[in-house]
Amino acid sequence: MAREQYTTVTEGTHIERPESQLVHRIGIYGWRKRCLYLFVLLLLIILVVNLALTIWILKVMWFSPIGMGHLHVTQDGLRLEGESEFLFPLYVKEIRSRVDSSLLLQSTQNVTVNARNSEGEVTGRVKVGAQMVEVQSQHFQIRSEDGKPLFTAEERGVMVDTGRLRVTGPEGAIFEHSVETPLVRADPFEDLRLESPTRSLSMDAPRGVHIKAHTGKMEALSQMDIILQSSDGVLVLDAETVGLPELEQGTPGPSGSSKGFYEICVCPDGKLYLSAADEATTCEEHSHICL
């Protein structure tokens, strides 16, 4: 609203009256003023709510200057206390437990550890499942505490570097193909059995095969024939007594029918040879083989 201003003077003073001026009020009045106050109040309420939520989140998530909850940030990396669950892949350089506790990796399905090259291709994999443990790599090796190789597996073969490979199963060890070893020995006071249930058993060595029983006996049982053959050497039975208990005993035949029969003769050094059978012994006649 506008109003006219008048200037009053004392009597006898002549002052020129200024022209009439219009004066305008500056400000927000009415419903605009109430809306502005309401908007400022709403902003203040939102600010207080945000501050309260921020304080609540900091308290619930256990934020601190050294980390968040059980997750602490150290100079060596991240340190996590207690059990943790990762819903997505985890990429780290090293995972280790505390000095006084073990490291446990657990999953309801399986645990898979992959090693990748710079191109992202899998170069090694360890998969622990419910029924099997699978290792995929070009070279697999188990070392002792001092770094000595104990077990090595690769495409060329499997090598056990321990002083002794011991199989404690009741059925022993089953090999589908050949086995190369310098020594096969049973435990003390236990029997050693080499068995092939459906096929033959062969032992080959370029410098000989040595079988020895220190305190017990040695048996070779066969349903068919047992053949002891030496192509260039001799067959030596070095014992005080050589017995053939199950040797079949012959029966007298007609006289003059000794043709085609031989008798076994023994040299002083134990060498055996055959001599044509006759009514009397003929070993002395053919004893030149003992010379």
UniProtKB/Swiss-Prot annotation:
Glycans are attached at N110. Residues 1-37 are cytoplasmic. PANTHER family: GAMMA-SARCOGLYCAN, SARCOGLYCAN. The chain crosses the membrane at residues 38-58. Belongs to the sarcoglycan beta/delta/gamma/zeta family. Cross-link to form 2 major subcomplexes: one consisting of SGCB, SGCD and SGCG and the other consisting of SGCB and SGCD. The association between SGCB and SGCG is particularly strong while SGCA is loosely associated with the other sarcoglycans. Interacts with the syntrophin SNTA1 and FLNC. It comes from Mesocricetus auratus. Disulfide bonds join C265-C290, C267-C283. Pfam families: Sarcoglycan_1. InterPro entries: Sarcoglycan, Sarcoglycan_gamma/delta/zeta. GO terms for cellular component: cytoplasm; cytoskeleton; sarcoglycan complex; sarcolemma. It is a single-pass type II membrane protein. Residues 59-291 are extracellular. One of its GO terms (biological process) is cardiac muscle tissue development. It is found in: Cell membrane, Sarcolemma; Cytoplasm, Cytoskeleton. This is Gamma-sarcoglycan. The gene is SGCG. Keywords: Cell membrane, Cytoplasm, Cytoskeleton, Disulfide bond, Glycoprotein, Membrane, Signal-anchor, Transmembrane, Transmembrane helix. Component of the sarcoglycan complex, a subcomplex of the dystrophin-glycoprotein complex which forms a link between the F-actin cytoskeleton and the extracellular matrix.
